[in-house]
Amino acid sequence: AFISPDTTTRSLVILAEGTYKLQKVDVIFPVLHGMNGEDGTVQGLFELSKIPYVGCGVLASAVSMDKVYTKIIVDHIGIDQAKFVHVRESDFEHLEEAMDRVEKEIPYPIFVKPSCAGSSKGVSKAENRKELEAALYEAVKHDRNILCEETIVGREVECAVLGAVSYTHLRAHET
């Protein structure tokens, strides 16, 4: 099955036994993770197809999937966050200088993350310069933009937020 290129039908084309049929779609509830799933790609496809969907739009999805640009926006609006340095693939031409810049801004241990990889792909924790170099090489395998971020020691609190007509208070879960 695939989304019909005819935007007036707002449907899926289902192929079976040498023929096809159209299945109307009222709304799509994307339950996807990572690249192409939550980075604005599939949301853009839905918008081009004029099929309504649940969740964030293209821009919000794309920006929130990109750790570097999310940090830049959060910094711009003045929200406290872990210190960070953006390292680009092009910085690898002068990697020693790039690592000097990271070490000048952020004390060890340093978390090194591909900017747009999902989950924990390519994420490393560097305790020293040798580990920082290895972490940068691992991260660049997954994305050309890399986020180097200070370690924050403290409690991590998770809290699910569900929309409803009446609200029930749920406890936050500490990890």
PLM regions and their residue ranges:
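Short acidic-glycine loop/turn motifs at beta-strand connectors
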Residues: 163-166
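Conserved small/polar residues in nucleotide/adenosyl-binding loops
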Residues: 168-175
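ATP-binding N-terminal substructure of ATP-dependent carboxylate-amine bond-forming enzymes
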Residues: 1-59, 63-69, 76, 87-100
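Aromatic/hydrophobic pocket-lining residues that form π-stacking "cages" and hydrophobic walls in ligand
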Residues: 42, 135, 168
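Proline-rich intrinsically disordered, low-complexity coils
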Residues: 4-5, 52, 107-109, 169
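Active-site nucleotide/adenylate-binding loops and adjacent lid/helix of ATP-dependent enzymes
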Residues: 18-23, 61-155
